[in-house]
Amino acid sequence: MKLKGEAVLITGGASGLGRALVDRFVAEAKVAVLDKSAERLAELETDLGDNVLGIVGDVRSLEDQKQAASRCVARFGKIDTLIPNAGIWDYSTALVDLPEESLDAAFDEVFHINVKGYIHAVKALPALVASRGNVIFTISNAGFYPNGGGPLYTAAKQAIVGLVRELAFELAPYVRVNGVGPGGMNSDMRGPSSLGMGSKAISTVPLADMLKSVLPIGRMPEVEEYTGAYVFFATRGDAAPASGALVNYDGGLGVRGFFSGAGGNDLLEQLNIHP
């Protein structure tokens, strides 16, 4: 029970990875969730009870972020961990495929949600300094490698890599700042409305089939499997030395081979192991 008595604020926590994080943290901690969907927040509170506080708001609004922080402190007395997680994906729309008439609006939408929303979340939380807390940014494999999105999403996520490092410096020694880069997952993450993708969810893309032969671990992880790295960084004792750390938590994308996703596909046969 390393997180017992802790209070956590998660943005974009009513679906997808955010919901999985809420479910994981609420087993020990109190959790506040900022999300735009009042309906999903109501479901969350019904499912998880008094240990969860749902707050309707837009991560692009600093006032909404400040209100979320204020309500979390009013309800739970403090904030120990902030997880800026809300985001949208550009569905790997290449630069040549971005319509000129939509480019400016799409850029603003992706960066306002995926970057400005993260900056607002931290700006709204001087309470983290008081609690000597920590920030855990959700990045993406696109923060480290190409082809995890189009240029808009990739640029936004690589901006968060820089943000982790800068804020880890600026907020030291009082607040630890780290980042987790999950890989592909089956979630409800949407696309930019400015590109006509506002109602499109990642779950409609056959990612599991696409990634099976690409990832060294041989499969696409379940959403819940990504939550462990966040729990580690949030745990004061285990992660006390960690600040400015970036974890590629993506099924081994960085070690895939030229001709095969995994080099040990024949190990069982070679070692005469029969599971």
From Swiss-Prot:
Substrate binds at residue 140. GO terms for molecular function: cis-2,3-dihydrobiphenyl-2,3-diol dehydrogenase activity; oxidoreductase activity, acting on NAD(P)H, oxygen as acceptor. The keyword Repeat does not apply. The gene is bphB. The keyword Membrane does not apply. Its EC number is 1.3.1.56. The active site is at residue 153. Pathway: Xenobiotic degradation; biphenyl degradation; 2-hydroxy-2,4-pentadienoate and benzoate from biphenyl: step 2/4. Pfam families: adh_short. Transmembrane segments: none annotated. Belongs to the short-chain dehydrogenases/reductases (SDR) family. Keywords: Aromatic hydrocarbons catabolism, NAD, Oxidoreductase. NCBIfam families: BphB_TodD, PRK06200.1. It comes from the Bacteria. It catalyses: (2R,3S)-3-phenylcyclohexa-3,5-diene-1,2-diol + NAD(+) = biphenyl-2,3-diol + NADH + H(+). It is an enzyme of class 1 (oxidoreductase). NAD(+) binds at residues 9-33. This is Cis-2,3-dihydrobiphenyl-2,3-diol dehydrogenase. Coiled coil: none annotated. InterPro entries: BphB-like_SDR, BphB_TodD, NAD(P)-bd_dom_sf, Sc_DH/Rdtase_CS, SDR_fam. One of its GO terms (biological process) is catabolic process.
